[in-house]
């Protein structure tokens, strides 16, 4: 067998070499012996190595060296593999290879395997037979004849002669050949498991030749055998050659190609003389070793290939009789016949080799044989496909072509697979480790190990099966999960669609319902006028001229809206052009080498460090519209003075072109677009002729057409698609031309999901941004405007890549709430809360300049004050919270924002409804869009007098007014979004409000009656030195005093002090149950609050007055209720912490005490579900805002609002007035009227009328015996008030509800109601068991005698007071009730920033008091001294007795000796100098830097102190001993050591000063001990003298000893009351012990 080349591939097959050395597929020289690995050699004698007498030639018989022939074979093989058989060079090389033989041109001899090859190509020739992989259409295919030396065909050449010519004499004799053949046949039969016949056994042993062999022998020529014959005998193989060795196996006898015909009787296949079809004969090379030619045997019958296309490895040969006979193949006529194999006859008898034991089958050889068979079949199939006839059907030819191309791609596919396998090969220990078998001997496998191996294999199979099942299960689970997700997704989409459909249907239903109501209203109006016989009004509605008038009005309105539409379009175009220009400019700046400076508003370069003080500010003349710019315009620093000198001018809003471009660029743009049409700004200035509605120019058809168009367009909704569907480019569609659908919030927003209406609001805000517009988000309070703003910012940051900076301007009270919402919803947004002291704000400047922030939160004041810092930043967006503050166009905030700040995008947030006052509305629109809404006068003039052009003076009727209002709303619609709670009420829990009437205590009734009748407040007479006898005090602002009495009578200082003395309390403060017994509202709270706490309801308690909140705190402390307080004095940084503490889920505080004005704005207190309004506000919107702190988005529980109202009091009238105002506001807003003109003067007149008529009602009801009073019986309602609102309430409404009714109001469900009833029962039982039981409200028998006065007595006291006033002895001090602000807003802000508010207020107060004392000393020097003393002393004590933190009273002076020692010690410490340098150590300790200069010191040091403060305390007698002084000095040194680093100069100086103080004190104390008793007596005298001096300073008169002792005893019992204000003597750095000592008074120290 020959080893064929790899078909269509170049890789030789590995395998053991058949010879002594490696050999290529076609060996280049003769082998010295038979193939040792051949199966044939195992069955017969094998010749030994060649003798020395036969040298190995180095050159082929044709004259070609073997090396040259081998080098020629390589390119031939590569050309053959690459399919280059048609190349002429390939034919030339092939011809040279064919001539290497007995004549020139024959190639090298084949290997021993090639002797047996019956289906594989040689390297030189073409296909040897039909199964050759080389295509038959190659250059060597076709009919070829044996050629002679000259290349001529040898037609008559004898095959045997050719064999003899080509082969040398064989070294085997005849017997050896017979024996070899017998051995081969026996091996084949044994391989098939067949028994050996006897004659074959004899022939194998060489005893007797096989039958038939003798007859065949003489016919064989002795010299050689054909190269293509299936010679099975082992011959001398070719010599060793370079290249890899062929496989170590030999093909069994009879294994030819798959399509080879069976041989005939003579051993030659029929129809094949000597050569198989498809290729020329492959002769053996002729050489000197003539005896090395191998004998051949008769070829056996062929085994046909298996029909499955997958041949079995090495099928066994069958005997000639048993082998199947294949039909002979027809041979082309041009092919020469193959000569019969010749067996050479040798005379010399060789030595018989003994039979070796045959080796077993090698599985590697079987696999290789299988591969070779497959390759042979593939090659044969390729040949068949190439030789298909041309008459084949089209589809068959297509299939054949596909198959042929696929087979030709086999090697490429195999090579690709090998490369992939090499790349994907996994590293294993078996491949990378050393060969273990080379280092140890093989172990004999035992049965146990085989079983273990079998067991492991079984386990491995089970594990593989388990993994396969698991993987399959996971795959199935993933499919099921995907199906589930798929269904869920589509279910959610379907749900969203259904919700949207429902919302659309609801919207259309609501719209249809409203339209129906409107039609009914118009119909009713017509019927009403008809029934009232108002013929003129009825004709107005139905007359044709009315329609013409309406048509004219609509036409004029449409023209105005069209003008606005054009302005909007031009505004958007200008914005787009500006963006392009900015990009172009930016690109140009990037290409430029240097950086150009920024351009200021006047087109000049603007330095970064400039304060814009020398820049001109553009101004505009209000009436003419003339604009001054450049050098004509005033400078920024002289703007205010210039505006005063030039009335009629105002600051022009910054246009967009000024923000980024210069004047030169604007001129270039004007040159590029010289013919751009200027839009008409005002509809009244249109040149278009508008027909007179009274003339006949307007036909009925035209009027009807105009009306129809207006009807289609009058209800223009927020949908752009609807307008486009009607074919109208509507106003809203133009404004919101660019649409972007927003379905979800930004990923930057966490910790919550927006509601659906909030998503719609976000989409509207994004639409404003996309269309370069600004707008107003005017959702009702509590619907989440803050959250929607944060959503807009995060959406722009994520989707639009706009990271800011965003400027948000908010009130100071809501700044902390904004910061809290940002931290909660968008923690990734970098925000800056720009507030605090100037030093704190300056700390933000580096961050602002670097731009490392997204959002800046600040207040209105800092926007104005720090405009030199904040105006330098180019803001992307400006957002103004509580935007209704901008309604005044001339306010400073609006002017500063328009003049100094650059923000192309602006957004206003407001929760209050927009008032329909046209100037205010225009101011907002002008601030947002100055290019669209330019002139206020025209705007107001047109909407107020639309018929001014026609000369008519007729007022608009109702239908025309509604039309204009709708047109006005349409103007606003693209820029305004407002949703009410009722529109989203499905997402909010219910809110129920109850008004709970409260009764008055006897004390309240008495005080209220006298204050209402005479405007006086009863006193105990102590202010006139008539203590206990009673008196009166006339107070201003009677309504405020009545409200105080209704809230709590202890809000009057002297009432509480007198009652505390009457009830036996010390200190002038009433405690305990008498706190709530004195007020009906407090008594009601005492019943309600325990129930709410028991059921875990959190409460918001809103009050109008902070002094009332202080009394409330005392009550909460008495009942043990945990509470929080927030009012106007609460610092902004503390508010956020209070909100967070109250809103925590497990918070122990269930009451939040808030003032309505400070705590009712912008706070989120949704954890509370009960709102108690202790006293109603004049402005009903304030109370609504307070309610919205709890009733807002996020509230889960039902909200109960309890409004407390004292029965038959001024509070009922205030509540009625507030309700009336709220109703009027609703009517105005709904109807759109523009005549809402109420003033504070009218309100005061209205209240005065209330009080006057209430007094008459009170007297009349008292005379008739009725206890209820109502002013509405006789008081006519003020102008415009609906009389129905002021009808007297029913008797049931005046009744105070009982416990069961109150429980029904506050209970959410039946279980709570039952619990409340049981709590009331337990409370009543506990009160009944108390032996000292008192009624829950004070009764008249508990009141002191001085307060129970009849009207005549009160009248007499009032007259006496008036007489005293006339004679200059008025006892009422205006300082008691001071409603004026002692500081201006600017001073107050400055004091807040520097932290010196209390000191400044005290200074102002002292200045006022000093001026007053000066006036008193000038005017009242003739008054008696005794009464003046007592009155002044009482007033002094009363002045200090107010609620709040008690201040330090003026202490009694220290002994002069002690003061002297303290001063001496401190002076010695201060004057101490360093001995080495002469430096005064205390220089830096004398006075600390201020908080403004060194804020970090005050953050670290809790109690700062310096020598200046120590000296001041010595002067004020704060130190009672040297130990107190030592504490402060040591504290001073410790503060220095805490703040400064160890080892620093100040640190070391403080240590030295400590030792100096200690040594000086010891020295002075030793000197003090040496003094005698005489000095002590002198000290006592001096002390008494100093005391008397201090007393004389107080009362201006020196008192006697007895009076002085009594006064001192009285002062020792007196405690400062609740409401006294702090004085600057008590500082924040005082210790708690010192403050407690200050509170305790001066009684014990004065002795």
Curated annotation (Swiss-Prot):
Role of this protein: ATPase involved in transcriptional activation and repression of select genes by chromatin remodeling (alteration of DNA-nucleosome topology). Component of SWI/SNF chromatin remodeling complexes that carry out key enzymatic activities, changing chromatin structure by altering DNA-histone contacts within a nucleosome in an ATP-dependent manner. Component of the CREST-BRG1 complex, a multiprotein complex that regulates promoter activation by orchestrating the calcium-dependent release of a repressor complex and the recruitment of an activator complex.
Please state the Enzyme Commission number of this protein: 3.6.4.-
- Composition-biased stretches (Low complexity): 24-45, 130-147
Result when mutating residue 1540 to A: Abolishes binding to 'Lys-15'-acetylated histone H3
Q: How does it assemble?
A: Component of the multiprotein chromatin-remodeling complexes SWI/SNF: SWI/SNF-A (BAF), SWI/SNF-B (PBAF) and related complexes. The canonical complex contains a catalytic subunit (either SMARCA4/BRG1/BAF190A or SMARCA2/BRM/BAF190B) and at least SMARCE1, ACTL6A/BAF53, SMARCC1/BAF155, SMARCC2/BAF170, and SMARCB1/SNF5/BAF47. Other subunits specific to each of the complexes may also be present permitting several possible developmental- and tissue-specific combinations.
Q: Where is the composition biased (Pro residues)?
A: 1-23, 231-249, 259-286, 302-327
> What name does UniProt use for this protein?
SWI/SNF-related matrix-associated actin-dependent regulator of chromatin subfamily A member 4
- Tissues/organs with expression: Colocalizes with ZEB1 in E-cadherin-negative cells from established lines, and stroma of normal colon as well as in de-differentiated epithelial cells at the invasion front of colorectal carcinomas (at protein level).
The record lists the catalysed reaction(s) as: ATP + H2O = ADP + phosphate + H(+)
- Biased composition, class Basic and acidic residues, residue ranges: 74-89, 1429-1438, 1600-1610
Q: Which domain of life is it from?
A: Eukaryota
Task: Give residue numbers for sequence motif DEGH box.
Answer: 881-884
Q: How is its activity regulated?
A: Binding to RNAs including lncRNA Evf2 leads to inhibition of SMARCA4 ATPase and chromatin remodeling activities.
Give start-end ranges for motif KIKL: 1596-1599
Q: Which residues carry this modification: N6-acetyllysine?
A: 188, 626
Site location (Required for binding to 'Lys-15'-acetylated histone 3):
1539-1540
Q: Which disease is it linked to?
A: Rhabdoid tumor predisposition syndrome 2: A familial cancer syndrome predisposing to renal or extrarenal malignant rhabdoid tumors and to a variety of tumors of the central nervous system, including choroid plexus carcinoma, medulloblastoma, and central primitive neuroectodermal tumors. Rhabdoid tumors are the most aggressive and lethal malignancies occurring in early childhood.
């Amino acid at each position: 067998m020959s080893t064929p080349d790899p078909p269509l591939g170049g890789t030789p097959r590995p395998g053991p070499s058949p010879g002594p050395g490696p050999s290529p597929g076609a060996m280049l020289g003769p082998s010295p012996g038979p193939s040792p690995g051949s199966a044939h050699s195992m069955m017969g004698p094998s010749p030994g190595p060649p003798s020395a007498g036969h040298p190995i030639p180095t050159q082929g018989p044709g004259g070609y060296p073997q090396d040259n022939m081998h080098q020629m074979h390589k390119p031939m093989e590569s050309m053959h593999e690459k399919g280059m058989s048609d190349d002429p060079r390939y034919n030339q090389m092939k011809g040279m290879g064919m001539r290497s033989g007995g004549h020139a041109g024959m190639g090298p001899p084949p290997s021993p395997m090639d002797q047996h090859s019956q289906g594989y190509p040689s390297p030189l020739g073409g296909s040897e037979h039909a199964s050759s992989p080389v295509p038959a259409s190659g250059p060597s295919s076709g009919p070829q004849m044996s050629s002679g030396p000259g290349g001529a065909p040898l037609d008559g050449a004898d095959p045997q002669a050719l064999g003899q010519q080509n082969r040398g004499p064989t070294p085997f004799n005849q017997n050896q050949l017979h024996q070899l053949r017998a051995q081969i046949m026996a091996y084949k039969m044994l391989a098939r498991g067949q028994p050996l016949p006897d004659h074959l056994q004899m022939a194998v042993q060489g005893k007797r030749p096989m039958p038939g062999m003798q007859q065949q022998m003489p016919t064989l020529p002795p010299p050689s055998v054909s190269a293509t014959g299936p010679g099975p005998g082992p011959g001398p193989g070719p010599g060793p050659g370079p290249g890899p060795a062929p496989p170590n196996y030999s093909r069994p006898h009879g294994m030819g190609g798959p399509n080879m015909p069976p041989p005939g009787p003579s051993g030659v296949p029929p129809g094949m003389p000597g050569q198989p079809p498809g290729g020329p004969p492959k002769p053996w090379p002729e050489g000197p070793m003539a005896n090395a030619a191998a004998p051949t045997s008769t070829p056996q019958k062929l085994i046909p290939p298996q029909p499955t296309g997958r041949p079995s490895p090495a099928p066994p040969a069958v005997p000639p009789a048993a082998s199947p006979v294949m039909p002979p193949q027809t041979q082309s006529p041009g092919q020469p016949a193959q000569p019969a194999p010749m067996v050479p006859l040798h005379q010399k008898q060789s030595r018989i080799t003994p039979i070796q034991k045959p080796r077993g089958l090698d599985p590697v050889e079987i696999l290789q044989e299988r591969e070779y068979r497959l390759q042979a079949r593939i090659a044969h199939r390729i040949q068949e496909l190439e030789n298909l006839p041309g008459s084949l059907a089209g589809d068959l030819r297509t299939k054949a072509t596909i198959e042929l191309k696929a087979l030709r791609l086999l090697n490429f596919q195999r090579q690709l697979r090998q490369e992939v396998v090499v790349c994907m090969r996994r590293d294993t220990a078996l491949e990378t480790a050393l060969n273990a078998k080379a280092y140890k001997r093989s172990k004999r496998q035992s049965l146990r190990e085989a079983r273990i191996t079998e067991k492991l294999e079984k386990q491995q199979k089970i594990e593989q099966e388990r993994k396969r099942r698991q993987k399959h299960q996971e795959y199935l689970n993933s499919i099921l999960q995907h199906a589930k997700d798929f269904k869920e997704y589509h279910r959610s989409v379907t749900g969203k669609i259904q919700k949207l459909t429902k919302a659309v249907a609801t919207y259309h239903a609501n719209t249809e319902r409203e339209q129906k109501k409107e039609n009914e209203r118009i119909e009713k109006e017509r019927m009403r006028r008809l029934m009232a016989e108002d013929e003129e009004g009825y004709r107005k509605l139905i007359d044709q001229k009315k329609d013409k008038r309406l048509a004219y009005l609509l036409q004029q309105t449409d023209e105005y809206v069209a003008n606005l539409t054009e302005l909007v379009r031009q505004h958007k175009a200008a914005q787009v052009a500006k963006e392009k220009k900015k990009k172009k400019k930016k690109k140009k700046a990037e290409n430029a080498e240097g950086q150009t400076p920024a351009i200021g508003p006047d087109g000049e370069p603007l330095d970064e460090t400039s304060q814009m003080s020398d820049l001109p500010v553009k101004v505009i003349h209000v009436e003419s519209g003339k604009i001054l710019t450049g050098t004509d315009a005033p400078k920024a620093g002289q703007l205010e003075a210039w505006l005063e000198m030039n009335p009629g001018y105002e600051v022009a809003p910054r246009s967009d072109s000024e923000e980024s471009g210069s004047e030169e660029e604007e001129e270039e743009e004007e040159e590029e677009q010289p013919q751009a049409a200027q839009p008409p700004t005002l509809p009244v200035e249109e040149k278009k002729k508008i027909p007179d509605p009274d003339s006949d120019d307007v036909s009925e058809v035209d009027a009807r057409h105009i009306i129809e168009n207006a009807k289609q367009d009058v209800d223009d909704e927020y949908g752009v698609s609807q307008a486009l569907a009607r074919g109208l480019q509507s106003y809203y569609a133009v404004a919101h031309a660019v649409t972007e659908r927003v379905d979800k919030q930004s990923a930057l927003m966490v910790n919550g999901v927006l509601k659906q209406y909030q998503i719609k609001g976000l989409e509207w805000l994004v639409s404003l941004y996309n269309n370069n517009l600004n707008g107003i988000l005017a959702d009702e309070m509590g619907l989440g405007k803050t959250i929607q703003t944060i959503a807009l910012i995060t959406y722009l940051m994520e989707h639009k890549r706009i990271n800011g900076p965003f400027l948000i301007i908010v009130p100071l009270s809501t700044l902390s709430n904004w910061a809290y919402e940002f931290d909660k919803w968008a923690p990734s947004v970098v925000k800056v809360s720009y507030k605090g002291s100037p030093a704190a704000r300056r700390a933000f400047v580096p961050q602002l300049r670097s731009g490392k922030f997204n959002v800046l939160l600040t207040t209105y004041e800092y926007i104005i004050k720090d405009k030199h810092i904040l105006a330098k930043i180019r803001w992307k967006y400006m957002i103004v919270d509580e935007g209704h503050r901008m309604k005044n166009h001339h306010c400073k905030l609006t002017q500063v924002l328009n003049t100094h700040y650059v923000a192309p995008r602006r957004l206003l947030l407001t929760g209050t409804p927009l008032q329909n006052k046209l100037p205010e509305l225009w101011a907002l629109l002008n601030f947002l869009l100055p290019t669209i809404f330019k002139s206020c006068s025209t705007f107001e003039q047109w909407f107020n007098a639309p018929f001014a052009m026609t000369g008519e003076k007729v007022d608009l009727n109702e239908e025309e007014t509604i039309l204009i209002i709708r047109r006005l709303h349409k103007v606003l619609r693209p820029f305004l979004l407002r949703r009410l709670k009722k529109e989203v009420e499905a997402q909010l829990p219910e809110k129920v409000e109850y008004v709970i009437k409260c009764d008055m205590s006897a004390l309240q009734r008495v005080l209220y009656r006298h204050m209402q009748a005479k405007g006086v407040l009863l006193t105990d007479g102590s202010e006139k030195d008539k203590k206990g006898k009673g008196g009166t005090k006339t107070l201003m602002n009677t309504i405020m005093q009545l409200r105080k009495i209704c809230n709590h009578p202890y809000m009057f200082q002297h009432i509480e002090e007198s009652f505390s003395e009457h009830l036996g309390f010390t200190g002038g403060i009433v405690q305990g149950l008498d706190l709530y017994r004195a007020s009906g509202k407090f008594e009601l709270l005492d019943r309600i609050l325990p129930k709410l706490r028991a059921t875990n309801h959190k409460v918001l308690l809103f009050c109008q007055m902070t002094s009332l909140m202080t009394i409330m705190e005392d009550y909460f402390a008495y009942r043990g209720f945990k509470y929080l307080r927030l009012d106007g004095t609460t610092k902004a940084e503390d508010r956020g912490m209070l909100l967070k503490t109250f809103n925590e889920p497990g918070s122990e505080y269930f009451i939040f005490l808030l003032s309505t004005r400070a705590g009712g704005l912008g706070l989120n207190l949704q954890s509370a579900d009960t709102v108690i309004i202790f006293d109603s506000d004049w402005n009903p919107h304030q109370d609504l805002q307070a309610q919205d702190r709890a009733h807002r988005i996020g509230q889960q529980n039902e909200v109960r609002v309890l409004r407390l109202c004292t029965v038959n009091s001024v509070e009922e009238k205030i509540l009625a007035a507030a309700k009336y105002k709220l109703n009027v506001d609703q009517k105005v807003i709904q109807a759109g009227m523009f005549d809402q003109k109420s003033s504070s003067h009218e309100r005061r007149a209205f209240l005065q009328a209330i009080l006057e008529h209430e007094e008459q009602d009170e007297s009349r009801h008292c005379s008739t015996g009725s206890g209820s009073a109502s002013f509405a019986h006789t008081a006519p309602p003020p102008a415009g008030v609906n009389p129905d609102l002021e009808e007297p309430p029913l008797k049931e409404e005046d009744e105070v509800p009982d416990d069961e009714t109150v429980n029904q109001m506050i209970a959410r469900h039946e279980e709570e109601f039952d619990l409340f009833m049981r709590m009331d029962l337990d409370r009543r039982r506990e009160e009944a068991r108390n032996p000292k039981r008192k009624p829950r409200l004070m009764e008249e028998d508990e009141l002191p005698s001085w307060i129970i006065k009849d009207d005549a007595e009160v009248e007499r006291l009032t007259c006496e007071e008036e007489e005293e006033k006339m004679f200059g002895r008025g006892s009422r001090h205006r300082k008691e009730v001071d409603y004026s602000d002692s500081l201006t807003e600017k001073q107050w802000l400055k004091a807040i920033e520097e932290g010196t508010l209390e000191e400044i207020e005290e200074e102002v107060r002292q200045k006022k008091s000093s001026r007053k004392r000066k006036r008193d000393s000038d005017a009242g020097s003739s008054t008696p001294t005794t009464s003046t003393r007592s009155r002044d002393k009482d007033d002094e004590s009363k002045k200090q007795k107010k609620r709040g933190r008690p201040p330090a009273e003026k202490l009694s002076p220290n002994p002069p000796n002690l003061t002297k020692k303290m001063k001496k010690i401190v002076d010695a410490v201060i004057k101490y100098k360093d001995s080495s340098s002469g430096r005064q150590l205390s220089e830096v300790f004398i006075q600390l830097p201020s908080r403004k200069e060194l804020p970090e010191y005050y953050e670290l040091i809790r109690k700062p102190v310096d020598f200046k403060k120590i000296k001041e305390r010595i002067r004020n007698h704060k130190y009672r001993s040297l130990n107190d002084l030592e504490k402060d000095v040591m504290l001073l040194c410790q503060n220095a050591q805490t703040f400064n680093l160890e080892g620093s100069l100040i640190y070391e100086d403080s240590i030295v000063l400590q030792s100096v103080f200690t040594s000086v004190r010891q020295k002075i104390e030793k000197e003090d001990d040496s003094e005698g008793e005489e000095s002590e007596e002198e000290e006592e005298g001096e002390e008494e003298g100093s005391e008397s001096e201090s007393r004389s300073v107080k009362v201006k008169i020196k008192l006697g000893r007895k009076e002085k002792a009594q006064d001192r005893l009285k002062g020792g019992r007196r405690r400062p009351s609740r409401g006294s204000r702090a004085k600057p003597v008590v500082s924040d750095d005082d210790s708690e012990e010192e403050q407690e000592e200050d509170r305790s008074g001066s009684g014990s120290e004065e002795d």
